[in-house]
A protein has these predicted regions:
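Cell wall/extracellular polymer interaction/catalysis modules
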Residues: 1-128, 132-135
Length: 135
């Protein structure tokens, strides 16, 4: 069974990025961090709210992960570990909780959380991601 995956953006800050929550089958799974909304500019903006198909891929940098597909004007939008907005390059970072690192807004325990995400998604090659904004 393909799970329902929702990303709810909770806060958007040009300095600290877009903080959100990822739900799997309507259950809170983890915190997210994306670049701030900068009109969908490649590498520096979060992608627009909406529905997107995500497909499992083998990334040269992040190995086994999921790519958000068919984003207008964008490509290579991945789920991956990272802590601060500078780590995103337009992608979706996952972490256990929100916090601060060196004075920057961050998500914490990202590596372990990404590993848990991929374990939770074992056997699933595609899913639909619904992104909404609640700010």
């Amino acid at each position: 069974m393909t799970p329902t995956i929702d990303l709810i953006r909770l806060e958007n800050s040009f300095d600290g990025g877009a903080l959100g929550a990822l739900r799997i089958c309507k259950q809170m799974f983890c915190a997210t961090l994306e670049p701030a909304d900068r009109d969908n500019q490649p590498d520096v903006s979060c992608i627009p709210a909406g529905q997107y198909r995500c497909r499992r891929i083998q990334s040269p940098r992040f190995w086994d992960t999921f790519e958000v597909q068919h984003v207008p004007g964008r490509s290579h939008i991945l789920f991956h570990p990272g802590n601060r907005q500078v780590d995103t390059a337009g992608c979706i970072l996952v972490g256990r909780t929100w916090g601060q690192l060196s004075g920057d807004r961050a998500i914490l325990n990202s590596g372990n959380t990404f590993e848990r995400f991929m374990i939770r998604m074992k056997g699933i090659d595609e899913f639909v991601l619904t992104i909404t904004e609640s700010y």
